């Protein structure tokens, strides 16, 4: 009985580890595009809806003319299926809808791609994703390409993976989000109002408020082609 119990526990642990860390994530090719009426000469590439608010809203407000690419949450297949909101029965497209509302308020072009949102792993089809990013960057010579840093800001594995892919592609004028404790974001009042768009992410935004308060960017060195 003891051996059976230990084997059972081991199997459960293996299943949990596989589901959280090892399983391949859904990697779809569908793209939702919006606000194409707005001109864009700068490109922001983020992993999840709300990343643009937490790490890049100062830039979006201060320097209009952005196209924002959100890599995840394009369809029911690419939502985070182990998130609290999903498990509590929220509609499956809630984060996508919140992102679109934010883009409308900020007058940004946007695309939402169809890669699965997950906190614990980033096991996407990386060859496919890299090709998609390369095709995106060939569309236009952007004045700035702004994305996650190699540390993933607070260590998020999907942030790290997107940053690494863009470092490998090495587009001109590549910048990453940067936490600068010596600066204070001058748009905190406006950003607080905008944050209400992300009702589902209220706790996450409050938890990571310091990244909003001290938003900055930094150029990637040796990035000329």
Swiss-Prot record:
Main location, first listed in the record: membrane
Q: Where in the cell is it found?
A: Membrane
Q: Which is an annotated GO molecular function term of this record?
A: N-acetylglucosaminylphosphatidylinositol deacetylase activity
Instruction: List all annotated glycosylation positions.
Output: 73, 222
Q: A single GO CC term, please? A: membrane
Q: From which residue to which does any coiled coil extend?
A: 114-146
Provide this UniProt record's keywords sorted from A to Z. Answer: Coiled coil, Glycoprotein, Membrane, Transmembrane, Transmembrane helix
Q: Is the keyword Repeat in the record?
A: no
Please indicate which superkingdom the organism of origin belongs to.
Answer: Viruses
Q: Which residues cross the membrane?
A: 2-22
List all disulphide bridges recorded for this chain.
none
Its placement in the membrane is given as: Single-pass membrane protein
Matches recorded under PANTHER family: N-ACETYLGLUCOSAMINYL-PHOSPHATIDYLINOSITOL DE-N-ACETYLASE, N-ACETYLGLUCOSAMINYL-PHOSPHATIDYLINOSITOL DE-N-ACETYLASE-RELATED
What name does UniProt use for this protein? Uncharacterized protein L374
| UniProt organism field | Acanthamoeba polyphaga mimivirus
